[in-house]
Each structure stands twice: as C-alpha cells, then as structure tokens.
C-alpha cells in the first residue's frame, strides 16, 4: 500500500545552470524577434538590405545630389551628369497648382482652399465642438461660397427659372396642405395655392414665345410676363403658407412646411448665385492642375457616398421596381470603364440635348465621375449591410422603429463602420482616376504636367521623369493621408470588443 510518505522526492544532485533568458527589449531583441528569428527570415532580411543598398544610393544621387535646383531654361538641365530637373518644377509650379487660372485672381483659389481646411480640420478632430454647425457649413455654405469664388458668380439665372421653382414648391405645399386639412378654410387656401402657382408657370412659359414689352417694378426693368409671373408666384407663396399653417393635420403640415422652406431656400441660393459680387468671371476651361484634381475628387467623393447608400438600399429593397432599377444601374455602370462614361458625358450627351442647350464640360465630367463612383460605392455599402445580423433588424422592429429610422439609427452606422476600409479604398481609387479627365480635354495635375513637357524652353531628357515624380509625390501625399486617417478612424470606432 502506497502512502504519502512514499511519494516524497528528495533531490540528491544540483540542477544544471540554465543559460540567461533572451532580452525582451531594445533594438537587439527586436531584430532577433522580427528580422532574424529563423534562417529563412535572416536570408530574406539580408536580400532586402542588399536590394535597398543597390537601389537607394542612385535615387538619392539623382533626386538630391546631382539634381538641378535653379535655372532659367532647359540649358540648366542639359548637363550629362545632371539629375532631376527641379528647376522645371519650380518654374511651372504655379501652373501645376492653378492651370491657366488668371494670375491676379489666384487669391480666390487660395481663399477657397483655406475655407475648406477651416471646415475640415475641426471635423477631423473627434473632440472638436460644434460638429453639427461644422457639417452645415461644409454641406451648405462652403459649396456656394466656393462656387462664387472660383467662377466669379453672377450667373445668368432667368426669372422664369426661379418662378418655376417657386411654383413647384407652392403646388407641393398646397396639395399636402389640402390633404392635411380637415376644415373648409385650409382646403380653400390649399386649392388656391396650386392654382396661383400654375398660373405663374403658364405665364413664365408663355414669356418664352411672346414679347409683350417691359415693366418697371421696384426700380428694376422686367419683361411684362416675368413681372406677372413673379407677382402670381408671390401670391402662391402666401396662399400656400396660409394653407399649410392653418392645416390641423400636424404630420401633413410639417411635411408641407419642410417642402416650402426647402424651395424658398433654393430660390434664395439662386438669388445669391445671380448676384454680382464684383468678381471677374473665370471660365472653367481656364481651370487646371491640382485645382481640377481636387474639384473632381471632392465633388465625386461627396456625391458618390449618398448615391451609393441610396443604390445599396434600393438593391436590397423589397419593391421590385426599385430593386430592378438600382440593380440595372449598378451593373451597367460597373460594366463600362470610366473613360467610356467620360467620353459619353462629354461628346455624346450634347447630341441628345435640345438645340441651344448645353452643359459645361467640367460639369458633365463631374456628373459622370459621381455616377461611376456611386455605383462602386453601392456595392461596398451593400457588403456592409449584408454583414449586419438579422437580430439587429428584429430588435429595431421590437422597439417600434420604422424602416427609415431603423436604417438611420441602427443599420447604416454599423454597416458603414464595417466597410470603412472599402469606402476609403474607393475614395483613393477615385482620387487617382481623376487623371482620366484628360481624355475629354480637361487638364488636371497630371495632364498639365504632361502638357508642359512640350514647352521648348524646358524640353530636356530629364524633364519628363522629374515631372512624373512630382505628380506622383502629390498623388501619394493625398492618398497616403486618406489611408492613415481611415486607419485612425477604424481603430477609434472599433468598440466591438472593449469592456
């Protein structure tokens, strides 16, 4: 029988002394753990170091040591031992940034860039206050100010255009007010508003084909029918406001007020764009360089994100028509290259417009880039929506949320957080694809760099390589910045496993 005393073990010799443990800190430990942890890793590390030793010295010598930093023309870069011709970049730097934008008006581009940075910087800092006001500034105020600064404002907006918009708003508000009304008086006001707005629209349309003289109103000379249309539109606004404000149906009244305010705000924006601020007009064909690159990229990014969300929701919709239209649009746009979309928008679209009607070439490019990027963004967002478990939808239904409340408060925040890498990847791809607008004659940064290669004052064997390196560095700075900020945002929002 074995007892506890029999299991006692007493060592009769000393334990051999072990080697000291490997250090867990310092550069030596890091090298051993990461670069020389095995024979294979050691061989790969040595080969990598050899490659860097082989490639880096020539690059440094070409870009810095033997580079030409100053000069008046191509003669400075024709020496056989000369490296990069940075004198060419220095001489053409302003053109690379602004294109052919007038020199005396380039302060407007600088001011626009400053206003953009002022709006983006607080938005990019998580702890910065007044986020809602900042978003309102970037979405509403900044685009209007930037458009006026870059173009000069004073757009030729016909009175008829404003009247048509006012009439549309009055018709919408009047109809909703009538539907929301429960008594006779609001109903009458709701009927009169569309009637007055319809009369204003007819008067404005008739002015296209008749010339009945002019009339002076408040010191301004208007065509007679324009003045009549404006007066009828004013009556329609008053009657529409009376109808929606007196309607006892609260939900309908709120919707009508929202539409009425939105149309009134749109008319105000048109009035601001039509105002003369004393700025000389600058046509978009004079834009170029980094200005065009940033305009196309920012408009494409801002426009493609909401478009992609709408298309993704439409493709997952239970309504057959909505799902079919969204699917056809996404698959059609994804099936053609961006060059084809830009070519169609620039060359083919004007052929289908009525005689005398045309769009600015840059505007057509912006629309094409936005639609193209929106189709790809839709698939990225749809991937995030499919990753949300069904229990999230059921939980939202259990607390009584509607479909749009569920999407806005529960589903979309989680889905967008999941696909942050895919979203930023689409943004980076869009930023690099802006160089394709050169196909339709718009000179972005890369296009203006290539265009200056033909300048006889700077034509040399070193000029093209230097220009491409400069353009590549600019693209890399913006793309790398977006990539790093997306990683920071992804880590900041990664709260799934925190306690």
Predicted regions and their residues:
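Transmembrane alpha-helices and adjacent helix-loop boundaries
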Residues: 2-499
């Amino acid at each position: 029988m074995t007892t506890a005393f029999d299991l006692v073990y007493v060592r009769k010799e000393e334990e051999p002394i072990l080697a000291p443990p490997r250090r867990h800190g310092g550069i030596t430990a890091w090298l051993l753990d990461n670069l020389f942890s095995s024979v294979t890793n050691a061989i790969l590390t040595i080969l990598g170091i050899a490659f860097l030793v082989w490639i880096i010295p020539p690059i440094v010598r070409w870009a810095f040591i033997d580079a030409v930093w100053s000069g008046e023309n191509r003669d400075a870069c024709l020496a056989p031992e000369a490296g990069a011709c940075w004198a060419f970049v220095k001489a053409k730097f302003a053109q690379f940034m602004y294109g052919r934008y007038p020199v005396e008006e380039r302060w407007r581009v600088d001011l626009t860039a400053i206003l953009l940075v002022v709006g983006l910087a607080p938005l990019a800092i998580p702890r910065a206050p007044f986020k809602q006001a900042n978003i309102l500034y970037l979405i509403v105020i900044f685009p209007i100010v930037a458009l006026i600064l870059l173009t000069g404002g004073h757009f030729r907006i016909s009175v008829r255009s404003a009247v048509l918009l006012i009439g549309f708003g009055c018709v919408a508000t009047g109809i909703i007010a009538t539907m929301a009304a429960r008594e006779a008086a609001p109903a009458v006001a709701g009927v009169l508003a569309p009637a007055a707005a319809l009369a204003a629209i007819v008067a404005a349309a008739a002015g296209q084909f008749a010339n009945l003289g002019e009339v002076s109103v408040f010191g301004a000379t208007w065509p007679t029918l324009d003045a009549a249309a404006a007066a009828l539109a004013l009556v329609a606004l008053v009657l529409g406001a009376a109808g929606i404000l007196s309607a006892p149906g609260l939900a309908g009244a709120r919707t009508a007020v929202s539409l009425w305010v939105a149309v009134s705000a749109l008319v105000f924006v048109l009035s601001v764009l039509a105002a003369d601020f004393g700025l000389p007009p600058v046509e978009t064909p004079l834009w170029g360089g980094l200005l065009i690159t940033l305009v196309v990229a920012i408009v494409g990014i801002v426009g493609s994100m909401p478009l992609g969300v709408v298309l993704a929701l439409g493709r997952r919709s239970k309504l057959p028509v909505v799902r079919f239209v969204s699917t056809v649009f996404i698959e059609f746009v994804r099936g053609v290259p961006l060059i084809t979309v830009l070519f169609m928008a620039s060359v083919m679209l004007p052929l289908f417009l009525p005689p005398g009607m045309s769009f600015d070439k840059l505007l057509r490019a912006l629309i094409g880039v936005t639609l193209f990027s929106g189709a790809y963004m839709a698939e990225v967002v749809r991937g995030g929506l499919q990753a949300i478990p069904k229990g999230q939808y059921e939980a939202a239904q259990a607390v009584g949320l509607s479909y749009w409340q569920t999407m806005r408060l529960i589903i979309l925040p989680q889905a967008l957080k999941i696909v942050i890498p895919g979203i930023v990847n689409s943004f980076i791809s869009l930023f690099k694809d802006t160089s394709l607008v050169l196909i339709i004659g718009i000179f972005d940064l890369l296009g203006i760099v290539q265009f200056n290669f033909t300048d006889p004052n700077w034509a040399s064997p070193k000029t093209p390589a230097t220009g491409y390196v400069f353009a590549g560095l600019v693209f890399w700075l913006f793309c790398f910045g977006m990539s790093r900020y997306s990683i920071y945002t992804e880590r900041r929002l990664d709260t799934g496993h925190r306690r």
